[in-house]
UniProtKB/Swiss-Prot annotation:
Name of encoding gene: ALT2
Protein name: Bifunctional cytochrome P450/NADPH--P450 reductase ALT2
Domain of life: Eukaryota
Organism the protein comes from: Alternaria alternata
Higher taxonomy: Eukaryota, Fungi, Dikarya, Ascomycota, Pezizomycotina
InterPro entries for this protein: Bifunctional_P450_P450_red, CysJ-like_FAD-binding, Cyt_P450, Cyt_P450_CS, Cyt_P450_E_grp-I, Cyt_P450_sf, FAD-bd_FR_type, Flavodoxin/NO_synth
A Pfam family hit: p450
Length: 1103
């Protein structure tokens, strides 16, 4: 390939970068000549390539890249494939120009959402998805190749969806070969964007028109999918501090405006696309290098074993895995998911000391080359050697030697999220598996907008010879996320002590873009009060310009952003620079700085500057400056508390500003001034036997498109015992959306105190009488806002319609009677509250409204676990009932649409997250619905949907019982149980076939034979052509009769219709068998059933 001479020097004497000549068709420029590897290795530090209609300058040198990362001369250009992605993700943070007001506003709103505290709080959701992947691998066994890129894409897509918008794609529950449509569309649009960026528009529009049509169609599909998520959240709001809620509700701190819906869509798509593809690439290449470098793999595993052992990985573990972080850094150095980025000059400029570039000229920095600079990384720069990325060596890297997360203000704000997810994923994989390399694999690269290895597979073997079930148990052993709680007993005698006898106060000042400093300010305020200090004020830095307090010590907590102050500290720093010597005398101060080592050149620059300016101009430093590196080996909160304990508080104590306060290295010994007694909430105290359990996990078990099935894991109160087959009563709460609707309707504040008196106390059981209670708590926890309105309720409401609205009264009266009531109210679960919202002309008092409601009653759910499965814990399996469908209220209401109500309890359960409390009480099963663990009695279990719950508990207990017996007998396997069948009906194998892996393990152990029926996919394997479970029973009639004659017990769990259909099949069969065996003389099946022995045919019917 020939290279032209540099162009003639400009008037300033500097040539443009040399341009690669086309070797084939000049009108196509270098399109047919592009070979990324050859370009980066053979054409020098700076050159230019021609795409026919435009040219790009290419830079491969670290030194020149350092120039281009100077944001006073150059800014990011969303060029190339990124520019083409605007059709998909609009003006998101990835694609919009920095000076675009939409980018600036979105950045101000979104950047604080990625502070360390929020990211740390996402750990449970990240672990949830990672556990799904690991359990899937364990159940595949060591003989099945794992397609690494596919698995990592599932992991990262599901994680970012769950953490940011509380949505589950459930990718790991899809059959192999059936890709999540969203993920498939993402890969397609990214691939086509890259192709488009390398071709002239006339080729894209005229030659590639079919590809462009597909690209545009999939872009619309992706945007529509995000729009649906947003609409769903608005219709079904959740009290969750996630990215979606924040983007919909937070205001731009400068303009006071919220983000438009279009910008919310743009940025959510940006996170989904840019976030999951890049992290998937990082994890895929990390697996490749670990497989290629056994010594690195062994060292990384040893670190995980020493730090975590076999316990559940917690947030505090991640900062104690420095070698694993070095492995990921080295992976990013060699295989940056995004091979570079574009910048443009802010004005005509000269780069590399000699090349002229015009204003707005697109310049591409190839970081694949910059990251392999031998002057920085040595002659072995192309080799994978994590030791070169140890913290000590990493801190010594020259500027711009490592930029996988971009530069400056346009650096990736999701970096902490990606690194936490990546460290967690690799640590969990190494903790639980031995990795088996495919010796025949040779690295091949696939380039879209990111880079990933093609065809990479490995096999995995659970470590230490564990079986898949053992891996599952190990993942959920004592984790520290929750501990068994004592049963509440009115008052537990606990004391909270706070002293306020210190005469001094603190002024706390914070400044950061991400909100981290603000969180630390709140922590300091709490700790200061605990130690006897008052807090005079908590302010942002810009608010104390020329107002630095002199009467109290000032603690300033701040961060740097590429060497510059945060937005809310810029004025403060500017003012400090203008102060003169002695001007700040009398000010006593301490500074704490936050930063991240990946920006080593500007680490703690602003905190150091503030500390220096204060001291130089007369202020007194009361404690040495503290710092915390959020990329370091400890977490920021520990660093901060260590600093306050060792330096700040001891100084204050020595100056007698914390009188009568004992420090004792942060010990919790304090003078008693305030006594706080803890007791049960009134709604719990009114019901005997209820105590608090703690949620440890809440996971979805079904795919989109069917009513959601979920499993809730609870840490039970201490002393709580149950049997497999028992039920758990729970106290639900109304949705925050319904509570807010009531408050708005009656013009109440959430904190308004309401007192209820009644002359007929016995009619108001369940309501708090004669005691003040906050309105928000009354409507959340005491009355059922979603209960279907009775015909009488509607008649009462009709009588309260304003006299000048006769039409509304007629509508209500028509709804209260006959078929209209059944079809338009009862079937659609329309509540009194729904009617008040729909018809504001109903004039009802608060007392009248309460009189129409029923107290909230407990709901019962079957345990889906056995008591010995995980002592102290239990699971419930439930269906989220019927929320979300739009229904027409009635013809006579002019087809006004109303949302069908979901079930109160199931909707409430679906909102719970780890560490939430739930009040529970034991509800024993019928004596006939227990498995007596008889080894000689056959069992026939029949279930539909979540009716499978008690049978999972039965099988768990049987498995553990066999294992215990084998242990006592000194053999590997105990004798088998009698034949056990499970007939299970659901919609389809890829939709809601619950506990597939668990049941497969039970079958492999010889504990059960599973027979399925799929109502939406009766041709699927395993259904024997049956849509419903009664059909499957009829197909097995002969063997069922044989088992009945052997004394089999039958257990049925499901809805009333299903149970009736089951008996319609089995009743005549078993009745006839008993007649033939002369065990009954009854000719009537119904009468025969009443003569059966206890537990011979037992039913649990859903109500």
């Amino acid at each position: 390939m020939a290279i032209s001479s540099p162009s003639q020097a400009r008037s300033v004497g500097n040539p443009s970068p040399r341009c690669v000549k086309s070797s084939t068709y000049p009108f196509l420029g270098n399109i047919l000549d592009i070979d990324p590897d050859n370009f980066t290795k053979s054409l020098g530090d700076v050159y230019m390539i021609n795409y026919g209609s435009y040219r790009d300058v290419i830079v491969t040198s670290r030194k020149v890249a350092q120039e281009l990362c100077d944001e006073s001369r150059f800014c990011k250009l969303p060029g190339g494939a990124i520019d083409r992605m605007k059709r998909v993700i609009g003006n998101g943070l990835f694609t919009a120009e920095t000076r675009d007001p939409r980018w600036q506003s979105a950045h101000r709103v979104i950047a604080p959402l990625f502070n360390p505290m929020r990211i740390r709080g996402m750990m449970d959701d990240m672990r949830d998805v990672c556990e799904q992947m690991c359990l899937r691998w364990a159940r595949f066994g060591p003989g099945v190749p794992i397609k690494i890129c596919d698995e990592m894409t599932k992991l990262t897509l599901d994680t970012i969806a769950l953490c940011t918008v509380d949505h589950r794609f459930n990718s790991f529950y899809r059959p192999d070969g059936i890709e999540e449509p969203f993920a498939e569309a993402v890969v397609n649009v990214m691939t086509d964007s890259l192709i488009q960026s390398n071709l002239p528009d006339w080729i894209n529009n005229w030659v590639r028109f079919r590809s462009m049509n597909k690209f545009n169609r999939q872009a619309d599909e992706l945007r529509h999918a995000i729009e649906e998520l947003i609409e769903s959240r608005r219709k079904n709001p959740v009290d969750r501090n996630d990215l979606l809620n924040a983007m919909l509700s937070h205001e731009d701190p400068e303009t006071g405006q919220r983000l438009s819906d279009e910008l919310v869509v743009d940025n959510l798509l940006t996170f989904f696309i840019a976030g999951h593809e890049t992290t998937s690439s990082l994890l895929s290449f990390c697996m490749y290098y670990l497989l290629e470098c056994p010594d690195v793999l062994q060292k990384a595993r040893a670190e995980v074993h020493a730090t975590v052992g076999t316990s559940t990985i917690m947030p505090e573990h991640l900062s104690k895995l420095p070698y694993l972080e070095s492995v990921l850094r080295e992976t990013l150095r060699l295989r940056d998911p995004g091979p570079g980025f574009f910048v443009k000059p802010l004005r005509d400029d000269v780069i590399a000391g000699k090349y002229f570039v015009k204003k707005d000229q697109s310049i591409f920095i190839v970081f694949d080359s910059v990251h392999r600079d031998p002057d920085v990384y040595g002659d072995d720069a192309d080799e994978f050697r994590p030791e070169r990325m140890s913290q000590e060596k990493f801190d010594q890297l020259p500027p711009c030697a490592y930029k996988p997360f971009g530069n400056g203000v346009r650096a990736c704000i999701g970096r902490p999220f990606a690194m936490q997810q990546a460290i967690l994923a690799v640590a969990m994989i190494l903790q639980h598996f031995d990795l088996i390399k495919d010796e025949s694999y040779k690295l091949k690269i696939h380039v879209t907008m990111t880079v990933r290895p093609i065809g990479l597979t490995m096999k995995v073997r659970p470590r230490e010879g564990l079986r898949a079930t053992d891996v599952n148990l190990r993942m959920h052993q004592a984790s520290g996320t929750a501990t068994p709680k004592p049963l509440a007993s009115g008052t537990d005698g606990s004391m909270l002590t706070v002293t306020k006898n210190g005469p001094m106060h603190l002024a706390i000042v914070h400044a950061s873009n991400s909100g981290t400093s603000e969180a630390l300010a709140g922590l300091l305020a709490s700790n200061a009060v605990d130690r006897g200090l008052g807090v005079k004020s908590i302010s942002v830095a810009n608010d104390i310009v020329e107002k630095l307090p002199r009467d109290v010590p000032v603690v300033i907590i701040t961060a740097s952003y590429n060497g510059e102050p945060s937005r809310n500290a810029a004025d403060f720093v500017s003012w400090l620079k203008s102060t003169k010597q002695h001007e700040l005398e009398g000010v006593r101060y301490a500074v704490f700085g936050c930063g991240h080592r990946d920006w080593a050149s500007s680490l703690f620059a602003v905190p150091k500057l503030i500390d220096s300016l204060l001291s130089t101009n007369g202020a007194e430093q009361i404690a040495q400056m503290g710092t915390s590196d959020t990329g370091g080996s400890t977490d920021i909160y520990s660093d901060f508390e260590d600093w306050t304990t060792k330096f700040l508080f001891p100084y204050l104590n020595s100056k007698q500003e914390m009188k009568d306060t004992k420090l004792n290295s942060g010990a919790d010994t304090r003078d008693v001034d305030l006594h706080v007694s803890l007791g049960k909430p009134p709604r719990v105290a009114m019901r005997k036997g209820f105590a608090a359990a703690t949620v440890t996990k809440n996971r979805s078990l079904s795919a989109p498109g069917v009513p959601e099935k979920c499993e809730l894991e609870l840490c039970l109160p201490d002393g709580f015992t149950y049997k497999a087959g028992d039920h758990l009563q729970i106290l639900p709460r109304n949705s925050s959306n319904d509570v807010q609707s009531v408050l708005r309707h009656f013009h109440l504040e959430a904190e308004t105190l309401v007192s209820i008196q009644s002359a007929h106390r016995n009619k108001r059981l369940g309501l708090p009488l004669d005691v003040p209670i906050m309105a928000s708590e009354l409507f959340a926890a005491y009355v059922e806002l979603g209960r279907t309105a009775s015909s009488r309720n509607i008649h009462v409401l009709a009588g309260l319609v304003r006299s000048d609205k006769p039409k509304i009264k007629r509508i209500l009266l028509s709804l209260a009677n006959g078929e209209s009531y059944k079809t338009e109210v009862l079937d659609k679960r329309i509540s009194v509250l729904d009617l008040l919202k729909q018809f504001p002309d109903i004039e009802i008092s608060l007392a009248g409204f309460l009189s129409l409601l029923m107290p909230i009653r407990p709901r019962s759910y079957s345990f889906s676990s056995g008591p010995n499965w995980k002592p102290g814990f239990a699971t419930l399996t439930y269906t989220v009932v019927g929320a979300g469908k739009l229904v027409s209220k009635a013809k006579m209401t002019e087809h006004v649409a109303m949302s069908m109500r979901g079930g109160l309890a199931s909707t409430f359960l679906s909102t719970l997250s780890a560490r939430d409390d739930l009040y529970v009480s034991l509800d024993p099963a019928s004596p006939s619905f227990y498995d007596d663990q008889s080894v000689s009695c056959p069992i026939i279990m029949i279930a539909a949907g979540t009716g499978i719950a008690p049978f999972i508990g039965f099988l768990q207990e049987r498995k553990l019982s066999l294992a215990h017996t084998a242990l006592l007998q000194g053999s590997k396997k105990a004798g088998p149980y009698a034949r056990t069948l499970l007939f299970f009906g659901c919609r389809g194998p890829a939709l809601d076939s619950l506990y597939t892996e668990e049941l497969a393990a039970f079958e492999a152990d010889g504990l059960v034979e599973v027979r399925r029926a799929f109502s939406r996919d009766h041709t699927a394997a395993g259904s024997n052509g049956c849509k419903y479970v009664d059909q499957r029973l009829a197909a097995s009639a002969e063997e069922l009769v044989e088992l009945w004659r052997l004394g089999a017990r039958v257990f049925v769990c499901g809805g009333k219709k299903m149970a009736n259909n089951v008996f319609d099949v089995l009743g005549p069969l078993f009745h006839e068998a008993d007649k033939l065996d002369q065990k009954t003389a009854e000719d009537d099946v119904g009468k025969w059933r009443t003569t059966l022995g206890k537990g011979r045919y037992a039913e649990e019917i859903f109500i």
